[in-house]
Every structure is written in structure tokens, then in C-alpha cells.
Amino acid sequence: MKNNFLRLILLLFTTAMFAQVDKVSVVSNDEGMKLVVNGKDFMINGMNWDFIPIGTNTVDANFWNKSDDIIKAGLDTEMSLLKNMNVNVIRQYTGVPAKWIKYIYEKYGIYTMLNHSFGRYGLTLDGVWTPVTIYSEARTQDYLLSEIETLVKEYKNTPGLLMYLLGNENNYGLFWQGAETEDFPDDQERINFIGESRGRPMYKLMNEAAKKIKLMDSTHPVAICNGDVLFIDIVAEECKDVDIYGTNTYRGASFTDMFKVVKEKLNKPLMFTEFGADAFNAIKNSEDQKSQAYYMVSNWKEIYENAAGLAKEDNSIGGFTFQFSDGWWKFGFDDR
């Protein structure tokens, strides 16, 4: 009798724990491609979010290492503003404790897309910092797949987790040497060479990571974050197990043929992981919120017009405005 009672308690506890975890899936039907959460269609009204006070950067802000009272105060201030503007998902990088993903979701109804940078900004391998990630190396592959496994174990049962995101325009990182924007080579042969020699191993490894995630967690989809559509043909060949194509795209007021190209090349849902415009007008050397609003409204209009069932490309599942706080800390960041 006692054993039966203990089994019942364990069953109720397990059921309650997993009942809190949302079932998120990608659905493709006659209407098009869409994201579905717990059986309901879900359009991402997203925001790139982090908490970096004035005078700090991503390295020394250490927000998640503060006391719970400080973290809660910061989240309550930020998330109340985001909720008021109908944001339903924020993009966060790894490092956020699972309990705060849960807190944000349960108090404000805002999900988290959890982003592993996947070597975008370098790795520490065998105790040595390597600023440029070589994805064809066995030790790099082992390290990243091990990190992904640890990540999924830690977060897969977290209420408020929407999906996993791999990378941050890592295809650009194949050319750039740091976090700041640099020029691309003009030589198309050089670009193609980089794509084949460095890009293909990276995308292949991303696909291996996606397979590992989905083997461990069947309730949350996996996306990659690519820079625009550079190397999309390689993505089509190597990333067949990735659920969603995420892209950082800055083309001005219109995404032009982005929806059509992604549909024809990949036949996967399209998610804008970054887009938008600055509030600072470099020509006028002054703040210009009206100009920013013009670009943002135009971009969001296209994102919605291309959602499932609206008779355009039917493959848009939403996007993440870039970004909630200013990024002035990035200037000179690589000169530390």
C-alpha cells in the first residue's frame, strides 16, 4: 500500500513537472508554414534583449551573477515594457539561468528563444583561446557538440523555452576576425572558396547539433541564425534536419525577395532573428526616431503579409526587432 502511494505521488509530480513544458512544433499544411505552440498558431513578435547598463558590456555587466533582488528588479522593469508593446518572445544567449526564463514566462507571458553562439566569437580549446573557430577540426566539433548536449540537458524542461537557436550570422564570422562589422572580400571566387572550405563544415556541424538536440528534446524546434542568404545553397545541402531558417537581415525598408528565395531554396519557415534600423541618423548626426519607425513598420508589415494563409509566400513565422537597448558598448569592443 505504501509503495503504491509513493508511486502515485511520483506519477503526479512527474506529470505536473512536464505539464508546464510547452509543445512547440513547425507545421506545414495547405495554408503554408507556421509555428504552433500547444496546438495554437503562434506568430513571433520578438525582441533581441539583454541587460547591459550604461558603462558596461556583455562581458562585465554580469547581470545573471547579481543578487536575485537586483535581477528581479531589472526584469520587472524591462519585461513590463516589453509586455506592454505585445512582445511575446525574447532572444537570449546562453548564460541565462533556467529559473529566470521560467520567471519571465510565468509573470509576463514572454517566451525565450535560447541562442548558443556556436563558436561565432571564438572558443577556448585545450585551455587556449582561439579567436577564429575552425569547424573542420575534430576537437572543435567534439567541444561544440558536448556544449550543446549540456545545454539541452539543462534547459529542455524549462517552462517558457520556445526553441533553440544555433549561431549568430556565423557565416559572416568566417570572414570577420572579431565582433565588429568588417568588409567582405570583393572577389567572388574568394567568397566561394570560404563557403566551401570553412562554411560547409560549419553548416554540417550545425546539422549534427540539430539532430542531437532533437534526439534529446522532441518538444522544441531548432533554428540556425545565418547572415542574410549568404551560402544558402550550402545550407540547403547540409542543414536538412534544422527546422527553421533564421536570418539577420538589413536590406532597408523591404526584405525584397527574401521570402521567395528561402521558400524556393529551403522550403523551411523563415524567421528574422535580427532586422530594423538605428534610432541614430549618421547623416544628420542626431537621434531620428521617425526614420527608425519608418523602417520598422515597413519591415513588420512584410513579415506579417508573408505569414501562412495570407496568399503571399506563406512561410514567415515572425521576427525579432534589433534591439531593445542601445549597442554603443560594441564600439572598440575588440580592442579590449
PLM features: what roles do these ranges have?
Residues Q20-K34:
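Short acidic, Pro/Gly- and aromatic-enriched capping/linker segments at domain boundaries
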Residues N315-I317, F322-R336:
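Aromatic-rich peripheral "rim/lid" segments of glycoside hydrolase catalytic domains that contact
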Residues M1-Q20:
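Bacterial Sec-dependent N-terminal signal peptides
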Residues L125-G127, F175-A179, I283-N285, W329-D335:
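Short aromatic-enriched loop/helix-cap "lid" or pocket-rim segments at secondary-structure transitions
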Residues D30, V36, K40-Y245, R251, ...:
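Active-site mouth of glycoside hydrolases
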Residues F13, M17, M43, M271:
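Conserved Rossmann-like nucleotide-binding pocket used by diverse enzymes
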Residues V261, K268-A277:
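Aromatic-lined glycan-binding groove of carbohydrate-active enzymes
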Residues A223-V242, T247-K260, D278-F320:
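Non-catalytic scaffold segments within catalytic domains of secreted glycoside hydrolases
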